[in-house]
Amino acid sequence: GHDGYIHELNDHYHVEICPSRPGGMELILEYRRKMLEVFAQARPDYIEIGAYDEGGCSCRDCAPWGCNGFLRTCEKLIPVIREYMPDVKINISMWQFGTFTGTDVEFEGVEKALKEGRLSECVYLVAEPQYAKYPFEHDMHRPLIHFPEISMYGAVPWGGYGANPLPGLMEKLWRENEDKLEGGFPYCEGIYPDINEVIMLRLYRDNQPAEDTIREYLIYEFGLRGETLEKVLSAIMDMEETLERTFEFPGVCNESTDRSAQGAGAHRYIIAHPRKVFAIEKAIADADKGLSEEVRKSIRWQLIYLRAMIDAELVRNHYERNEKVLEYFKQIVTICHLEHSGMYTKPDIEA
């Protein structure tokens, strides 16, 4: 049942187990043991236990999952983790809390449980700053770890168009809550958000403005200097404005639609704010001419270059995929080893 839930839980692996059903908890722990046996020798410093995105149960005995079935599962799982990794620190992730219920009930339940002394082994709580306000406005009885969305933002497939620098957003998310945070976990799904990772790490360590970090990045990774450096820096900053887009198929404008079901036709990727696309293209293309062959072929530069070229070509071609854009997409697939990836991470190279 989904009593009180506004969305179905994600179930894309179809292996969800309800811990409230007979034998369910035992089976979950059995599977976790198999995983822990494989990674025991890795000796990680931290293990993070998350309620979502895969997993969870919304039956009446488990709901609300994040503060009921999930917490009960954590309490059973932590002793098993300790058998294999006695010194590891345990973090509890609150990612997607409230997404499926539309309320703060899961945050409230975790707050109450920790206040009562449950989950004493939990060292940190992990909270997403884009969408979750509750943990940053209440005493959660544990220090918070920052979990900014640096990957799955503004475009689908994320990373499918090259680099996705988000300097303004990254700095905003840090500045809003920096006094409430003990550190961060800028999780990513590939190398394309590399600039965002570096921005966040420098904010965590040195409180350094994003623009200064990008300038350092361009000097260190590509050896840029002088006027070229400043023009490329401006282009990278502007890529945040030109990132947001939707893809469109015949009769469809829905980035969450299964592409394999749409059939043949025009492949369109409509950039919401294209005004600076050609200036970005020129700055990156001009800089590319002055780079050494080694730097020009580096993965980090290629992802910046391809993003600039793809966006400009799309605008020239009324946002439709032509042969040139298709070739750029194929280069991203090769560079990032996405041949067997899914639709949310693989550029649209299908017919």
Predicted regions and their residues:
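Catalytic-core regions of glycoside hydrolase
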Residues: 1-224, 319-350
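Catalytic domains of carbohydrate-active enzymes that cleave complex glycans
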Residues: 175-181, 191-193, 205-351
